[in-house]
């Protein structure tokens, strides 16, 4: 009979799902409010491209040392610190007074958000038995599309009615609440679960989960945004071609 996951494991998994959702919600806000930021700071496409590429690069690079820390220190504390940091910096993004201030704040947001994946995946490995682990990873990864969906659904309306800075302020609030909850969550013993057998189905799920967190996947979603939100511009471009 499959081993039943304890309530503590389910509770922490829910927190990890929420952290992942906020991770992708917060990072998507600039993509939604791109036009008002462009107008206020007088930016061209080159500056916006540098901003997106720099965030992706720092996010990818910072994950390596943060993964090292997740192997040696309390992962719940690493997640709490990372979530608190990127929530503060998300709120600070709304206080940016120039493009350069916004640029450096967003780079620091990338460092904070890079703490999520290594610590969360390590926790899931110790919280769930092998026959439940792929399902737990699937629930955790559900935060990615739901975070994007939530951001594209409400950030535009908030920016239109209250200005582009307000979504950054509001996005920070739930981060502080969840950070406090994960801070005091019980840390599972490392290596307490037996290794998961490498079946074909589980390898496929792992590959999909890994790709969905990759910069290539996120970049593809952001590149697809203009065709969804501004079809008339693409239509004009197509006619010129």
Placement of each model-derived feature along the sequence:
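Conserved MFS/SLC helix-loop-helix module at the cytosolic interface between two early adjacent transmembrane helices
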Residues: 61-100
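Cytoplasmic helix-loop-helix junction between adjacent transmembrane helices
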Residues: 105-145
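Helix-loop-helix hairpin linking two adjacent transmembrane segments in secondary transporters
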Residues: 140-186
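Extracytoplasmic
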Residues: 11-45, 234-239
């Amino acid at each position: 009979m499959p081993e039943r996951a304890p309530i503590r494991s389910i509770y922490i998994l829910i927190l990890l799902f929420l952290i992942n959702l906020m991770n992708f919600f917060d990072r998507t806000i600039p993509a939604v409010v791109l036009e008002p930021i462009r107008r206020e700071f007088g930016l061209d496409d080159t500056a916006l491209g540098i901003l997106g590429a720099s965030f992706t690069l720092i996010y990818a690079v910072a994950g390596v040392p943060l993964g090292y820390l997740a192997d040696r220190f309390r992962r719940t504390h690493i997640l709490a610190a990372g979530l608190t940091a990127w929530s503060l910096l998300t709120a600070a993004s709304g206080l940016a007074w120039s493009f350069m201030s916004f640029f450096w704040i967003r780079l620091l947001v990338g460092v904070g958000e890079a703490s999520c994946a290594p610590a969360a995946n390590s926790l899931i490995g110790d919280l769930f038995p092998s026959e439940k682990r792929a399902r737990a990873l699937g629930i955790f990864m559900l935060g990615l599309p739901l975070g994007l969906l939530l951001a594209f659904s409400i950030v535009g309306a908030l920016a239109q009615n209250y200005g582009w800075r307000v979504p950054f302020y509001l996005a920070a609030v739930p981060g502080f609440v969840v950070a406090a909850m994960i801070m005091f969550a019980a840390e599972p013993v490392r290596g307490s679960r037996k290794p998961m057998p490498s079946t074909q189905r589980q390898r496929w799920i792992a590959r999909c989960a890994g790709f969905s967190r990759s910069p290539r996947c996120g970049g593809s979603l952001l590149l697809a945004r203009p065709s969804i939100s501004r079809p008339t511009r693409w239509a004009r471009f197509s006619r010129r071609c």
